[in-house]
């Protein structure tokens, strides 16, 4: 990569890291909030769904406006907006105010992905590698969030965790304001990967797969910290911190998945790889809830590696099957289905947790994912 490409990747990667930190603090403190507000996991699950739905809904107009106002403006709106939303969360004294703050947080976080991914797909010569490195930053955000949430909650309060992330985005906004304008001086090369016609059928199939993958991932991430906390009660240490550290350990392995996805995605047929990934997700997701101890943690690590390998492959596949002018909207719709519609997995998981126990969420989510195998097989034939 040349200097300009590295510059773009650094800015987008930093924003990607903070996005996922913001979105995963809430799942990491579910048991704390359950006790503080005296509510069930089903109620908290639907609040997580509300935040995820806003995370998805905002991605569609964001994809459209990316081509109108540019990535710099959208990044600044994301950073400033999340600071405001976080302040609402920090001062919240009721469950409704907390839910409002989380909904606003999801909405402003939704701005990032279409802008960042479109910048990479248009201005990074090696898309698969760029998507992989960008994804690694997101994986770091996911991995750091439980530790940040658990540490601040244990030492201070859960509100301090959100306040810390607001400060991080404030610093990031300063860097964006002063450094990103240099992108205006760049000469944007004609997109040599430009697809003349969008493959609509392939795109519909990909979006459909994204819904199922999103549902299962939302259920997984929302209740994994709680599951680990409850399954390791005999271990020493703070329950919140213990669940956070184990969750971070598992999610950190997503970096391996990102690297593998970037490596194989640039060498083999992306649609075929996607099919294999969907198939492998099913058994390892189920095993998280069907096993205990080290086998449970090992199953979680393998699942995360497999699941996260899809991101660079899937994002590159969208670039392959969409016309360049439609790409921002294409990414926006993709994230709407994956994070918005898929976000209902948190609500479904909450209902399962209240009626059958947290451990049953994971095999249930693996069953929900089975139709995606057939859709991935059809996609393989359409690309």
Regions found by a protein language model. Name each.
Residues 268-317:
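C-terminal transmembrane helical hairpin of 12-TM major facilitator-type secondary transporters
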Residues 101-138:
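Cytoplasmic helix-loop-helix junction between adjacent transmembrane helices
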């Amino acid at each position: 990569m040349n200097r300009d490409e590295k510059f773009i990747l650094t800015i987008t990667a930093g924003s990607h890291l903070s996005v996922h930190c913001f979105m995963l603090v809430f799942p990491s403190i579910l048991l704390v909030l359950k006790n503080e507000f005296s509510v069930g996991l089903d109620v908290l699950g639907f609040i997580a769904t509300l935040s995820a739905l806003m995370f998805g809904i905002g991605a569609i107009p964001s994809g459209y406006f990316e081509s109108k106002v540019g990535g710099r403006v959208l990044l600044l709106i994301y950073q400033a907006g999340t600071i405001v939303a976080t302040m609402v969360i920090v001062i919240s004294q009721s469950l409704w105010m907390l839910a409002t703050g989380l909904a606003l947080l999801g909405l402003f976080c939704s701005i990032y992905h279409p802008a960042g991914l479109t910048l990479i797909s248009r201005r990074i010569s090696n898309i698969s590698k760029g998507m992989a490195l960008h994804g690694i930053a997101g994986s770091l955000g996911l991995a750091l969030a439980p530790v940040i949430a658990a540490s601040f909650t244990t030492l201070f309060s859960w509100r301090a965790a959100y306040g810390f992330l607001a400060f991080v985005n404030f610093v990031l906004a300063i860097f964006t304001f002063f450094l990103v304008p240099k992108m205006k001086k760049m000469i944007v090369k004609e997109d040599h990967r430009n697809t003349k016609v969008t493959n609509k059928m392939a795109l519909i199939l990909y979006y459909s797969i994204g819904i199922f993958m999103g549902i299962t991932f939302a259920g997984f991430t929302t209740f994994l910290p709680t599951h680990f906390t409850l399954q390791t009660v005999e271990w020493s240490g703070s329950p919140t911190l213990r669940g956070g550290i184990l969750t971070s350990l598992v999610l950190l392995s997503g970096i391996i998945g990102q690297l593998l996805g970037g490596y194989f995605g640039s060498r083999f047929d992306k649609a075929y790889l996607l099919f294999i990934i969907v198939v492998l997700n099913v058994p390892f997701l189920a095993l998280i809830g069907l096993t205990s101890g080290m086998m449970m943690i090992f199953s979680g690590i393998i699942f995360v590696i497999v699941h996260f390998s899809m991101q660079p492959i899937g994002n590159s596949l969208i670039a392959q099957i969409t016309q360049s002018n439609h790409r921002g909207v294409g990414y926006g719709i993709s994230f709407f289905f994956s994070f918005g519609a898929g976000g209902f997995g948190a609500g479904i998981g909450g209902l399962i947790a209240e009626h059958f126990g947290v451990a049953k969420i994971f095999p249930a989510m693996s069953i929900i994912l089975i139709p995606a195998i057939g859709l991935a097989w059809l996609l393989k034939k359409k690309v």
